[in-house]
Structures are given as structure tokens and as C-alpha cells.
């Protein structure tokens, strides 16, 4: 994340809440790759919370099969590992930032239920959420 992005987010936060959608972990031909944000840049974002969406690995594979979107095949174990690494990275960010961390289990939830859960969480930590 470069300084321009941090500056833009800081500017936007003056007038509204900001949600950042990040996929910090990627699957590469050789394995996994994460290019973590520096502690300085994370601190500059002044994050209030980190939310991770997760589900049972079998459900993740079913969702990928329904909408491949260029994603490669993977095993149940790899799907589980990717999610655990992503959750771990986000938890590390939360610890560095001193902010809340939530992992929302989407296994049995509809998109509307996931949205409602996320908005409820953000509301409870004091964000001005318009539903």
C-alpha cells in the first residue's frame, strides 16, 4: 500500500467511514504470497476494525465451482490453509493497529445475512452505519 492510498483514505475518513476490501494473501504457482503492509502504513490508516469472511472449506470449493472467476482448482486442505493464513494475517494487523478483529462465518449465511452481520458489528463499535 503506497502513501497515496493512505493519504486518500485519510482524506475520505474526514467525512465518512471507509471500508477497505483487501485480499492480502495470494496463491501463486510456488505456493502462497503475502506482501504485508508496514506497521507505519497500517498505523496511518487508523483502522477501527478488521473483518474477515470465512466458511467451511467444502463450502468455499462449492462457491468457487459455481463462479470460477479464473481461480484454479484446489483441495479441501488448501482451501482451509488459505483461509487460516488470511485470518492469521488479519489478526496480526489488528494486533499491530490495536483494533477489533472479527471473523464472520459465512458457511450458512446468505449475502444479505453476511452484510447484516457485518453492519451490526460495525454499528456496535461505534461506526455510523446506514442500513
Q: What residue spans do the PLM features occupy?
A:
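A short, acidic, amphipathic alpha-helical segment used as a generic capping/interface helix at domain edges
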Residues: 8, 39, 86-89
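A short acidic, glycine-rich active-site loop
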Residues: 1, 74-84
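Short glycine/proline- and charge-enriched loop/turn segments
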Residues: 67-74
Amino acid at each position: 500500500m503506497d502513501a497515496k492510498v493512505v493519504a486518500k483514505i485519510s482524506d475520505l475518513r474526514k467525512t465518512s467511514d471507509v471500508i477497505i476490501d483487501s485480499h492480502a494473501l495470494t496463491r501463486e504457482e510456488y505456493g502462497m504470497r503475502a506482501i504485508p503492509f508496514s506497521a507505519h502504513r497500517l498505523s496511518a490508516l487508523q483502522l477501527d476494525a478488521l473483518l474477515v469472511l470465512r466458511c467451511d472449506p467444502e463450502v468455499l470449493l462449492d462457491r468457487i465451482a459455481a463462479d470460477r472467476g479464473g481461480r484454479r482448482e484446489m483441495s479441501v486442505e488448501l482451501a482451509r490453509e488459505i483461509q487460516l493464513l488470511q485470518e492469521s494475517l488479519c489478526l496480526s494487523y489488528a494486533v499491530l493497529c490495536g483494533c477489533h478483529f472479527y471473523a464472520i462465518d459465512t458457511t450458512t449465511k446468505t449475502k444479505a445475512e453476511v452484510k447484516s452481520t457485518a453492519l451490526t458489528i460495525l454499528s456496535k463499535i461505534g461506526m455510523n452505519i446506514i442500513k
